[in-house]
C-alpha cells in the first residue's frame, strides 16, 4: 500500500488535511476534513505543480496529462485532477472519495502536485461556456497544499 498526505492552508481561515491511499494498481481512496468553508459545494482538484510560492495561484491549472476537457469524476472526458465537489456543513467538509484516474505512482501520480479547494461549486464541465470546460467555474482558490508520501 502507498500512502500520501496533504496539509491545506490558505490566506484566510480555510485549512484541512487530506489522506490518500492506494493498494497495488487500484483506485485511490481520498479522505479528508476541511474547515472554515462556507456551507455548500466547493470544487476540489489536483493541480499540476507542487509550487505554492505565490500562494495557491502558482499551482498552475488542473492536472491534465491527457489534454482533455474538464468534467465530473465519473466522466470519460475529464482532467485526471478533477475530483468534483466536497460538501461543507457547519463550515466543515468531511469527505471520502474513491477515484481510479489519479494514482500515487506512475504517469498519473499526484505526488508532488497540489490539492486545491475552491470557493464555489464545480459545475463539472456542464456550465455551457469555455471556462466550464477548463475549471468548472469553481472560482478562487481558498486553500492548497502539496501532496507528499506518508508512512
From Swiss-Prot:
Superkingdom to which the source organism belongs: Eukaryota
Enzyme class: oxidoreductase
Cofactor binding mode and count: Binds 1 copper ion per subunit. Binds 1 zinc ion per subunit.
Record-annotated membrane-spanning stretches: none
Lipid anchor positions (S-palmitoyl cysteine): 6
EC identifiers of the protein: 1.15.1.1
GO molecular-function terms, A-Z: copper ion binding; superoxide dismutase activity
Gene Ontology terms: cellular component: cytosol; mitochondrion; nucleus; peroxisome
The entry's keywords: Antioxidant, Copper, Cytoplasm, Disulfide bond, Lipoprotein, Metal-binding, Nucleus, Oxidoreductase, Palmitate, Zinc
Residues that, per the record, bind Zn(2+): 62, 70, 79, 82
Keyword rRNA-binding: no
Co-factor(s): Cu cation; Zn(2+)
InterPro entries: SOD-like_Cu/Zn_dom_sf (IPR036423), SOD_Cu/Zn_/chaperone (IPR024134), SOD_Cu/Zn_BS (IPR018152), SOD_Cu_Zn_dom (IPR001424)
Residues where Cu cation binds: 45, 47, 62, 118
Record has Metal-binding as a keyword: yes
An annotated GO BP: removal of superoxide radicals
Subcellular localization(s) per the UniProt record: Cytoplasm; Nucleus
Disulfide pairings: 56-144
CDD domains membership: Cu-Zn_Superoxide_Dismutase
Catalytic activity: 2 superoxide + 2 H(+) = H2O2 + O2
Record's function text: Destroys radicals which are normally produced within the cells and which are toxic to biological systems.
Subunit structure: Homodimer, and heterodimer of Superoxide dismutase [Cu-Zn] A and B.
Record family assignment: Belongs to the Cu-Zn superoxide dismutase family.
Protein name stated in the entry: Superoxide dismutase [Cu-Zn] B
Amino acid at each position: 500500500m502507498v500512502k500520501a498526505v496533504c496539509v491545506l492552508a490558505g490566506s484566510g481561515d480555510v485549512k484541512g488535511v487530506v489522506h490518500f491511499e492506494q493498494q497495488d494498481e487500484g483506485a485511490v481512496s481520498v479522505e479528508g476534513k476541511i474547515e472554515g468553508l462556507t456551507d455548500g459545494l466547493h470544487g476540489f482538484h489536483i493541480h499540476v505543480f507542487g509550487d505554492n510560492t505565490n500562494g495557491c495561484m502558482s499551482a498552475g491549472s488542473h492536472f491534465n496529462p491527457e489534454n482533455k476537457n474538464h468534467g465530473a469524476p465519473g466522466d470519460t472526458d475529464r482532467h485526471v485532477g478533477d475530483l468534483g465537489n466536497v460538501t461543507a456543513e457547519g463550515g466543515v467538509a468531511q469527505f471520502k472519495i474513491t477515484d481510479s484516474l489519479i494514482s500515487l505512482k506512475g504517469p498519473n501520480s499526484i505526488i508532488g502536485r497540489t490539492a486545491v479547494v475552491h470557493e464555489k461549486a464545480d459545475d463539472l464541465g456542464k456550465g455551457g461556456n469555455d471556462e466550464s470546460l477548463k475549471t468548472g467555474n469553481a472560482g478562487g482558490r481558498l486553500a492548497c497544499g502539496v501532496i507528499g508520501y506518508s508512512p
